[in-house]
């Protein structure tokens, strides 16, 4: 049962991060297409957002390790 819970925790967090990263990158590409002069500012904001979104799978991994080795 712990193995299933750990797999669900890491799977759902990876799924959420994948969807979030896709949305962030697509909106950034749309913004650059509309305003090419704002490319640098949009890219830095995008990288900060991706870093925050990638914290979710790391937390999912930690939670799955806690559940797995409990």
UniProtKB/Swiss-Prot annotation:
Principal cellular location given in the protein's record: membrane
GO annotation, cellular component aspect: plasma membrane; proton-transporting ATP synthase complex; proton-transporting two-sector ATPase complex, proton-transporting domain
Regions crossing the membrane: 4-24, 47-67
Topology in membrane: Multi-pass membrane protein
Reversibly protonated during proton transport (site feature) positions: 54
Compartments (UniProt record): Cell membrane
Classification via PROSITE patterns: ATPASE_C
InterPro entries, sorted: ATP_synth_csu_bac/chlpt, ATP_synth_F0_csu, ATP_synth_F0_csu_DDCD_BS, ATP_synth_F0_csu_sf, ATPase_proteolipid_c-like_dom, F/V-ATP_Csub_sf
Keywords from the UniProt entry: ATP synthesis, Cell membrane, CF(0), Hydrogen ion transport, Ion transport, Lipid-binding, Membrane, Transmembrane, Transmembrane helix, Transport
Pfam family, one: ATP-synt_C
GO molecular function: lipid binding; proton-transporting ATP synthase activity, rotational mechanism
Highest taxon of the lineage: Bacteria
PANTHER family the UniProt entry points to: ATP SYNTHASE LIPID-BINDING PROTEIN, MITOCHONDRIAL, ATPASE PROTEIN 9
Family named by the database record: Belongs to the ATPase C chain family.
Subunit structure: F-type ATPases have 2 components, F(1) - the catalytic core - and F(0) - the membrane proton channel. F(1) has five subunits: alpha(3), beta(3), gamma(1), delta(1), epsilon(1). F(0) has three main subunits: a(1), b(2) and c(10-14). The alpha and beta chains form an alternating ring which encloses part of the gamma chain. F(1) is attached to F(0) by a central stalk formed by the gamma and epsilon chains, while a peripheral stalk is formed by the delta and b chains.
Function: F(1)F(0) ATP synthase produces ATP from ADP in the presence of a proton or sodium gradient. F-type ATPases consist of two structural domains, F(1) containing the extramembraneous catalytic core and F(0) containing the membrane proton channel, linked together by a central stalk and a peripheral stalk. During catalysis, ATP synthesis in the catalytic domain of F(1) is coupled via a rotary mechanism of the central stalk subunits to proton translocation. Key component of the F(0) channel; it plays a direct role in translocation across the membrane. A homomeric c-ring of between 10-14 subunits forms the central stalk rotor element with the F(1) delta and epsilon subunits.
Listed name of the protein: ATP synthase subunit c
């Amino acid at each position: 049962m712990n193995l299933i819970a750990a797999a669900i925790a890491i799977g759902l967090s990876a799924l959420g991060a994948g969807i979030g990263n896709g949305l962030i990158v697509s909106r950034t590409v749309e913004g650059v297409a509309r305003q090419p002069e704002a490319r640098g500012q949009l890219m830095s904001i995008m990288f900060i957002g991706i870093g925050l979104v990638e914290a979710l799978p790391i937390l999912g991994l930690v939670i799955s390790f806690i559940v797995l080795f409990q």
